Amino acid sequence: YTVSNRVALGLRVEVDGKNGYAGTQTAQDAEELVARAIDNARTVEQTDENPMQTAQEYESVEFPACPLCGLSIQEKIELAKSMEQKAKAADARVFQTPHCVVSTGRMARRLKNTRGLDASVREESGAIALQAAVREDEEIHDGFAVRTGAAALDVDGCVTEAVQKAVACFGAASVRSGKMPVLFDREAASDLLGAFSGMFCADMAQKGLSPLTGKEGQM
């Protein structure tokens, strides 16, 4: 079980109509932070076109509560253990769970300045994730599933999905080359698009590194 905390402080100052920026993850460096922000503003050659906000009215937004965030540390550990146990009980061919994770997080953010702006937001999030590895004779496959938000306590659904994805790969084989109708799983479609995403990059096309260069507007 691991816990990590991160605090970040960003400062924006206005000096002679120019904005300077600086950031730190150590609150003790306040004086240095101010000095760096002022120094940054003095290096700017043009007047900033984004004036600082004054006091504003913001609509109150209620974020849904995370069901995992209310659990104790021990309860989260037990939840992870139960996922592994249920995965192995779901199918005798499950021999390992390389990833079995229960994760929660809380975030607080605040914007405040000397002109009256004071806005803040707090959020919490949680997720469970499982990778189930299955083996039959010489074949080994794995399946992955995740649940987030209000569904983060759906352990049974997460386990079933991960195991079914893994088991479904048994007996799979390459098909002959040819032209034929294809049904894409949504994750497979995403992976395929990702493999070719560089082709659609304007920078790659302008450099002549994309096979789509010069084919704009074609179908």
Place the predicted regions along the sequence by residue.
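Alpha/propeptide regions of enzymes that mature by internal proteolysis
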Residues: 1-103, 150-179, 184, 213-214
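Active-site-adjacent "lid" and substrate-binding segments of diverse enzymatic cores
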Residues: 64-66, 78, 95, 102-219
